[in-house]
A protein has these predicted regions:
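N-terminal signal-anchor transmembrane helix
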Residues: 60, 68-122
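Juxtamembrane helix-break-helix junctions at the cytosolic face
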Residues: 55-65
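Short, aromatic-rich membrane-interface segments at the entry and exit
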Residues: 37-38, 64-70
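Short acidic/polar active-site loop segments enriched in Thr and Asp
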Residues: 126
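Soluble catalytic domains of enzymes that build or remodel membrane lipids, polysaccharides, and related
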Residues: 101, 107-121, 130-327
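Short, Lys/Arg-rich, polar N-terminal cytosolic tail immediately upstream
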Residues: 1-7
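Membrane-interfacial loop-to-transmembrane alpha-helix junctions, especially the N-terminal start
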Residues: 9-17, 66-69
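Membrane-embedded alpha-helical segments of integral membrane proteins
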Residues: 12-57
């Protein structure tokens, strides 16, 4: 009797889960209607995995309608994930003109300084882009920064519109380079003090631009609107920049958000993940919920050689490493 009751209870739970994931799948397409729906767009891989599991379960239970529903919506999510499928990380044959960018969100709460130093030393990037650079991090990495002859740091407020009771920290966005550069923009958005930094670099008589970004996290309507305005400002900067372009950093948005899709379309940049893998980067401490919110985007005249995540260094984000050359 107890086993029958337990089985019936489990069936009910799985049906409720099926209903919930189907609803989340549908609402994820309505991100422009409400900021909460936009959050629902980010977990396509998780929806696909959950629905596939439920479909297999309902096959065993011979519940064909629920099986069809689970696999139908699993297919919907799979179609969105598929363009990012792949395990090959070499895109084009490397050559003597290869440039390497390392992008790291340090996480101001993270104190694993030696681990971060090891990532930077091992990667040996031509250009290092850092987000959430605090006073503590600045002091701990000072000798590493001294190895880069060209650098810029920009203070910004990552706590825009956070509640007053939350302790605030002074954070910076930084670009450190072995290649000479000139600053082309250090922008504070008019309604929001979250910056991006743009620099124009020169490598073997070829010029290209790098933008380092840390967009506002979409925690509420106001912050979501701020992030979306920042995406629009970036489009403007890209359109007026007549150079091969790379944008790296923490975008706080996944490829499945309608706002990200609009950004890619308007900027005409290429998503370096496509065809290589989803490569989720955050939150590193909760692996089943990890989503790709750190990005490396390039213009069509950038030849990508490889796109990889770097190793864990204690942050809630994993770093990104791009190797490329200028066409």
């Amino acid at each position: 009797m107890n086993s029958v009751f337990g089985k019936h209870f489990m069936d009910k739970i799985l049906i409720y889960i099926l209903t919930l994931v189907v609803i989340l799948t549908v609402f994820g397409f309505l991100g422009k209607s409400w900021w909460v729906f936009d959050l629902m767009s980010h977990f396509r891989v998780q929806y696909f995995a959950a629905l596939s599991f439920l479909g297999i379960f309902f096959i065993k239970e011979r519940k064909w309608r629920k099986t069809f529903l689970a696999f139908a919506f699993a297919l919907v999510n799979f179609s969105l994930v598929l363009p990012y499928g792949g395990m090959v990380n070499i895109v084009a044959q490397a050559d003597q003109s290869e440039i390497k960018i390392l992008s790291m969100n340090l996480d101001y709460k993270n104190a694993s300084y030696q681990a971060a130093r090891s990532v930077i030393d091992t990667t040996n990037p031509s250009v290092l882009v850092l987000q959430e650079l605090s006073a503590d991090w600045d002091a701990q990495l000072e000798d590493i920064f001294s190895k880069f002859p060209h650098s810029i740091k920009r203070p910004y407020n990552s706590f825009y519109r956070f509640p007053e009771f939350i302790k605030k920290r002074k954070l910076s966005l930084g670009i450190f380079s072995h290649l000479p550069f000139e600053v082309i923009t250090v922008e504070e958005f008019s309604d929001n003090p979250i910056p991006y930094i743009g620099v124009r670099l020169k490598f073997k008589e070829k010029q290209f631009s790098v933008f380092g970004v840390h967009l506002t996290s979409p925690m509420g309507k106001v912050r979501t609107e701020a992030r979306n305005k920042q995406l629009g400002s970036l489009v403007y900067e890209i359109q007026k920049n007549n150079q091969p372009t790379i944008i790296v950093g923490d975008f706080n948005i996944t490829p499945w958000s309608p706002y990200f899709k609009d950004f890619i379309q308007r900027s005409e940049l290429l998503d370096t993940r496509k065809g290589l893998g989803v490569y989720p980067t955050w939150p590193k401490q909760i692996f089943p919920l990890m989503i790709p919110i750190d990005h490396g985007l390039v213009s069509s005249d950038i030849k990508l050689h490889s796109f990889n995540r770097g190793p864990n260094f204690g942050s809630d984000h994993l770093p990104l490493i791009l190797n490329f050359s200028i066409s």
